[in-house]
């Protein structure tokens, strides 16, 4: 019988480190909710944590915009089809974002979290309401993100 030395079969529900999958965190501003039908996403976090997890073909089409499914983790049956696009180096959710902000009754100052689930090929969404989410001052990164960024 062969010996098993240091075999680690630990499974994770997320491809992200630690227990904080919310790699895109944002405190909503008036411009996210009232002045445009777009939610601009943090560029550094998109490029370090989201794009590497997406299919290459999907990333290649971001300039023209791609439809992605956004699923609310607090209500698994709630999902929305939203256009994810990049323009002038800025990533944003466009068409469909208005449905989410209205359905979830999002307000200025509310915090939201997002991440790309590569298994289901969809964006996971969480509304933290007006709760503060732990963020570092440098580039608005979470502790999980900061550790990964420092390793690069």
Swiss-Prot record:
DNA-binding region: 24-131
Keywords linked to the UniProt accession: DNA-binding, Nucleus, Transcription, Transcription regulation
MF (Gene Ontology): DNA binding
InterPro entries: B3_DNA-bd, B3_domain, DNA-bd_pseudobarrel_sf
Localization in the cell: Nucleus
Primary localization class, coarse: nucleus
CDD domains in the cross-refs: B3_DNA (cd10017)
Annotated SMART domains: B3
GO CC terms: nucleus
Protein name stated in the entry: B3 domain-containing protein At1g10455
Source organism per UniProt: Arabidopsis thaliana (Mouse-ear cress)
């Amino acid at each position: 019988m062969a010996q098993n030395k240091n075999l680690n079969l630990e499974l994770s529900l997320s491809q992200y480190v630690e227990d904080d999958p919310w790699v895109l965190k944002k405190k909503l501003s008036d411009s996210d909710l009232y002045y445009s039908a777009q939610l601009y996403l943090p560029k550094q976090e998109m490029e370090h944590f989201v794009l590497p997890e997406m299919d290459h073909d999907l990333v290649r089409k971001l300039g023209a915009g791609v439809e992605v499914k956004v699923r609310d983790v607090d209500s698994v049956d709630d999902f929305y089809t939203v256009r994810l696009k990049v323009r002038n180096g800025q990533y944003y959710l466009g068409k469909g974002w208005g449905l989410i902000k209205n359905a979830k009754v999002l307000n200025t100052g509310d915090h939201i979290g997002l991440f790309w689930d590569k298994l289901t090929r969809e964006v996971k969404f969480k509304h933290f309401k007006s709760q503060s989410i732990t963020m570092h001052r440098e580039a608005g990164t979470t502790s999980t993100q900061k550790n990964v960024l420092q390793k690069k």
